[in-house]
Curated annotation (Swiss-Prot):
The keyword Metal-binding applies. The metallothioneins are involved in the cellular sequestration of toxic metal ions. Binds six copper (cuprous) ions. This is Metallothionein. Keywords: Copper, Metal-binding, Metal-thiolate cluster. Cu(+) 2 binds at C5, C23.
């Protein structure tokens, strides 16, 4: 479950949209 975020603590993908919390992009 990676949404293009490096070191993301939480990634949620729904309806083609990805939300990452704690993302260390």
């Amino acid at each position: 479950g990676d949404c293009g975020c490096s070191g993301a603590s939480s990634c949620t993908c729904a309806s083609g949209q990805c939300t990452c919390s704690g993302c260390g992009k």
